[in-house]
Design a protein with these regions (language model features):
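NAD(P)-dinucleotide binding in Rossmann-like oxidoreductases
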Residues: 211-302
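N-terminal Rossmann-like dinucleotide-binding module
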Residues: 1-55
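C-terminal helix-rich "cap/oligomerization" subdomain common to oxidoreductases
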Residues: 1-7, 71-73, 81-83, 278-323
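A contiguous active-site-proximal alpha/beta segment in oxidoreductase catalytic domains
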Residues: 89, 112-171
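Rossmann-like dinucleotide-binding domain that binds NAD(P)(H)
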Residues: 171-241, 292-296, 320
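Local beta-strand N-terminus motif with an aromatic residue
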Residues: 36, 55, 78-82, 155-158
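Beta-loop-alpha module in the N-terminal Rossmann-like domain of NAD(P)-dependent dehydrogenases
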Residues: 25, 57-123
Length: 323
């Protein structure tokens, strides 16, 4: 894309308009000076669209949405980008829909659940000349950019890292698609992929992937990267929140400790989707090659045999029955 392209008002469609993350995409489309012309969701609780693009056409059935997008293309008003906020297991099919309609794709994580699906998508990219970009907002977080630069300047140094992310979810979670491993990829994929992607980006490619716990509500293991040994713990169980966090009535705890130093990145997320869109529109978004190692890592976690709980493991594992 040339610099002049960035000044053109791009036409977007959005799949998954009723989802939690969709408003961030609507805001990013608006704040980058572009237009949402069509949206899809089987659920019709989408009044949020009025806050951003009240003139956008809305559909609850994919077939009618498909017909509309095709009609726009044939009449010379084709969609330039399709933003995908649908359930994880549908991303692959919705990306293919986008590419077949000659549109670039902006996709929430995970791009796909299985790494081999990336191969087919790259083939379709080559056939259509359209690109697939994934939102990897942690790569744009100032504190994590600073950490990445610090690690790069340090040369061959190795790091000990503890990553903990507990985001409590209610009973609804297990009854939704998120509680179905075949649809969400499980806890490590659904709430952890953005962290694994960031860790790989900062500390280099994975060398070993050890899984100690892989339950419906939590997962834990050790990920050995080129320049770090990462003990990680992910959970949607409120009982796994630190006591101090529970006393405050909070439902989320996020921590990353690098060589004994806490890296604070809990704040600063407000405009990272908009920053991601700016990069994508400038042609510098994160493509399929850049998401591959993260997708491979969580796929390995999903299918791994559990390692014995001996030696080095995340401290929070001690509170689990498996220890």
């Amino acid at each position: 894309m040339s610099s002049s392209d960035a000044l053109v008002r791009r036409r977007f469609a959005l799949i998954g308009a009723a989802g939690y993350i969709a408003p961030r995409h609507m805001k990013a489309i608006r704040d980058t000076g572009n237009e949402l012309v069509a949206a899809l969701d089987p659920n019709d609780s989408v009044g949020i669209i009025d806050s951003y693009f009240p003139e956008a056409d809305f559909f609850t059935e994919f077939e009618r949405f498909d017909r509309h997008v095709d009609k726009l293309r044939r009449k010379g008003g084709k969609i330039d980008y399709v933003s995908i906020c649908s359930p994880n297991y549908l991303h692959d099919a919705h990306i293919r829909f986008s590419l077949r309609n000659e549109a670039h794709t902006v996709c929430e994580k995970p791009t796909v659940l299985n790494p081999w699906n990336l191969d087919a998508l790259q083939e379709i990219e080559r056939e259509t000349g359209c690109r697939v970009f994934t939102i990897q907002q942690l790569r744009l977080h100032p504190a994590l950019i600073a950490l990445s630069e610090r690690v790069r300047r340090a040369g061959e140094s190795s790091y000990d890292v503890d990553v903990t992310y507990v985001t409590a979810r209610g009973h609804w979670y297990r009854s939704s698609w998120k509680g179905d491993v075949a649809k969400s990829g499980g806890v490590a994929t659904n709430i952890g992929l953005h962290l694994f992607d960031m860790l790989i980006w900062v500390f280099g490619p994975p060398r070993q992937n050890i899984v100690h716990v892989n339950n419906a509500d939590c997962a834990a293991g050790v990920l050995v990267l080129d320049r770090a040994r990462v003990r990680w713990f992910l959970s949607i169980n409120a009982k796994h929140l630190p006591e101090a966090v529970q006393l405050q009535g909070a439902r989320t705890f996020r921590s990353m400790v690098v060589n004994g130093e806490e890296i604070e990145f809990s704040d600063g997320f407000t405009d990272l989707h908009t920053a991601s869109y700016r990069r994508i529109l400038a042609g510098t978004g994160f493509g399929l090659d850049e998401v591959r190692m993260g997708v491979e890592a969580v796929s390995q976690i999903r299918h791994a045999s559990l390692a014995a709980m001996a030696g080095d493991y995340h401290p929070l594992c001690r509170a689990l029955d498996v220890v």
